[in-house]
Structures are given as structure tokens and as C-alpha cells.
């Protein structure tokens, strides 16, 4: 299993880091089989798995539950878990309680937190306690209400300078990596060049140290529309619907189950049962 030291070395060597979300045992198993470097158990599970309109309703219990499943499916992959909305915008003691549970009960190797400001002290606090932290700047989904929706961040010089400053603060606080979401590719390159820790982009261009996408978006599974930055590499939901539709049709016409999918009893036993007739 790769560790934070390996990810730092990959940045230094210019080797891109791959990251993908997973939320359950089968998806984690497939992601590990595909040799993805790092798994993110994102609070995006609220939208793509649980059907919420945003990530806000996701709880610490949800994150623990899904992290456990992912760890069972991917025993040899570094797993980062999101701290959900309002689980770290509380007292440091409460933040540590939530963080400890996700790490100890869920099995996460690192935690991800969104934003800067007061979150910087949280990164420092958790890091000093021995919990690796991944920072997240740019479009931070837990704050879409304040940001005015899902919009590209850092498009003007002033806000771009603020993101650069915040990125440096995250690194200084001890973050082991930084996710940059929906920022101009030029800005992402500047930040990546100025930091010693790896940057993982999602909608941040190619001049970052790695990329992350949502599992369901990448394979087109249960999603109606995807963001501009998503490239869909396959469309499994079309195949799934096709297979289920064929099953329905075959059941309705009594084609399924054929003999090969059924069990039989010996003829003498059948005769002994009501003389081979139904009772």
C-alpha cells in the first residue's frame, strides 16, 4: 500500500497520482484491482449513493459505515475519508471525537476537510494528534450555499491570490495533500509549483500532481448528468438497464428460469411424492 511518503515521492518524480471515490465493498474492490493509488470515501456519497440533493445531510455515522465497507474491499489501498458537514466546525474536542471515530472505527488512513480560515487550525490540531489530513480548496461542496452554487473559483486575480495564500497555509498546518476543485488550470499550476505537498485536481486542469473523479461519474452509473470536467470512460448503466429489462421480459414470458438454472429430484423420489402427482 502506498503511503503519504510515497505520494510525496511521486510528486517529486513527476509521477501522476490517481485517486477515485469508492463507497462500498464492490466498488472499492474494483478500484483496487484497477491499481488506483488512493481511494476517497467522499461525502459525495450523499448524492450519488443516498440520493440527497447535496452533501449536507451526510453524517459521521454514514462516513464510518461506508469507510468500513471500502476498507473491506480495498485492503491494500490508501483510503482518505471526508469529514462531513459541521463535523469539524465545532469545538476542537468535538472535532477530535468525530475524527477519532472515523479513523478508529471506520479505518480511514487520512481525513479530508474543506476550506481554509478556521479550518487551518483544525488541520494543525489533527496533524499534531497524528491524524493525516488532506485539505480541499476551490469549490468546496459543503459551502455551495455561501459560494453561490457550483461555480469555478479563483477566476479573478484577487480570489486567485487568496487561494494561493490559503494553499500555503494548509501546507504549513501539516496537510499531506491538497485537493483543488473547479479552479482555472493556470491557477492550479501555480499552486502545484509552489507547494511541496501533492495537489490532486478535480476540474483543475492537467498541471497538478494527480487527478480525482467520482466513481459513478467516471463509469456513468446512476447519474443523469455530469460536470464539465468529467470524462466518462464507459457507460455501465446502459448495460445494467439492458440486462434488467431482458430479465423482466423473460420472466413475463416464462423463458426464465430455463432448466439449466433449476434443480430436479430423482424420478423415484418424485413418484414417491403423491405418486408423482401434486397433492
Curated annotation (Swiss-Prot):
Is Manganese set as a keyword in this record?
A: no
Q: Which CDD domains match?
A: KPHMT-like
Q: Which keywords does the record carry?
A: Cytoplasm, Magnesium, Metal-binding, Pantothenate biosynthesis, Transferase
User: By its UniProt entry, which Gene3D superfamilies does this protein fall under?
Assistant: Phosphoenolpyruvate-binding domains (3.20.20.60)
The cofactors it requires, by name, are: Mg(2+)
Q: Which family does it belong to?
A: Belongs to the PanB family.
What name does this protein carry? 3-methyl-2-oxobutanoate hydroxymethyltransferase
Taxon lineage: Bacteria, Bacillati, Bacillota, Bacilli, Bacillales
The encoding gene is: panB
